[in-house]
């Protein structure tokens, strides 16, 4: 069918970011039975794709800093405070509290108390939903010249298994 072939060629010419992963290998052990266990893995790999932290509330901080054109300045401030680059220090986020708080305070022109309060409540205040995640993907697409994003997920059926919450989570995302 010529129409089908033309559509396939047209689809093949659209710039696309492909995110290929095995869901089980990317899953966190702390969310194996949560209702959003599939969403959390998708969020993690999407953050990785953008060069952000795999820790959700840390990635949220990075998005905030990027949006406010403070990310590079923050990374430099963390490097001065920690003696290592941000990409390394963020993996030890909880052990680098004082250095990160100091850097955030300086870069965002916040008091030490405000920065400490932010740090101490960042994880607790972080919330993600499928709707928020979809908006993030939409923003990413719009910021990247309408480039498509395709998630190719291996072993998702086995990962969800007979967990009705996980299956509903997957169904809602798709």
Give the location of each predicted region:
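P-loop NTPase motor core
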Residues: 1-92
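Glycine-rich, often proline-containing surface loops adjacent to acidic residues and nearby aromatics
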Residues: 13-27, 113-118, 146-158
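Flexible loop/turn segments at secondary-structure boundaries
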Residues: 27-31, 107-111, 157-161, 167-168
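Residue-level signal for secondary-structure boundary elements
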Residues: 50-54, 112, 145
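Short coil/turn segments at secondary-structure boundaries
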Residues: 55-61, 118-122, 152
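Short, flexible helical or helix-coil boundary motifs
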Residues: 72, 107-111, 144
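Long, low-complexity, polar/charged, intrinsically disordered or flexibly structured peripheral segments
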Residues: 79-133
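Conserved Walker B catalytic segment
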Residues: 125-174
């Amino acid at each position: 069918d010529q129409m089908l072939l033309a559509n396939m060629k047209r689809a093949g010419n659209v710039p696309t970011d492909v995110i290929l992963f095995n869901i089980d290998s990317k899953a966190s052990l702390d969310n194996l039975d949560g209702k959003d266990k599939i969403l959390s893995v998708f969020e993690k790999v999407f953050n990785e794709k953008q060069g952000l932290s795999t820790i959700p509330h840390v990635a949220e901080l990075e998005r905030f800093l990027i949006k406010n054109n403070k990310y590079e300045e923050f990374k430099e401030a963390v490097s001065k405070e920690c003696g290592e680059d941000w990409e390394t220090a963020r993996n030890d986020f909880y052990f680098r509290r004082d250095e990160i708080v100091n850097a955030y305070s300086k870069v965002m022109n916040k008091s030490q108390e405000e920065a400490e309060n932010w740090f101490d409540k960042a994880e607790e205040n972080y919330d993600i939903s499928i709707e928020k995640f979809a908006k993030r993907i939409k923003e990413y697409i719009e910021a990247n010249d309408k480039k498509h994003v395709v998630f190719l997920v291996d072993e998702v059926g086995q990962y969800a298994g007979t967990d009705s919450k996980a299956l509903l989570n997957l169904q809602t995302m798709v």
